[in-house]
Amino acid sequence: MRTDEGFVRAWTMAAEIAPERWRAMHADMILVLRAASWELERGRSDDTLAVLRGPEGLGQVRIQPEVIAFNGNAFLGEAGDPFSIERVAERGIIARRSRDGSRRVVRRCDTRGQPYDLAVCAVLLTLLHHLGD
């Protein structure tokens, strides 16, 4: 399989996540990112660049109280679309409301099959666990 054909991950979720629910999910996403990073870095020498980087493919993974965002390493040619989850979405909100009346947000991330796809999939499974469908 060619890695340039795209690995597009797309999902919808609530446009706003309740603070208590976000705190639990945020903590689990950090644990999952640490585990994914450990797996991605296993067997690599200490002088190589980290696989997971900030949303632009540079710097540190962005872990803030209301946002988690990351990408692959741009220096290694392993960056694709940034992956970002926010407690309160500011973009991508669709007008149609879900059954419970809340607004939804549409998200996508094309990792192009780069190594950080592992972290993207792991975080998406964490979202599914906490938020359901």
For each predicted feature, which ranges?
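Acidic (Asp/Glu-rich) sequence patches and key acidic residues
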Residues: 1-133
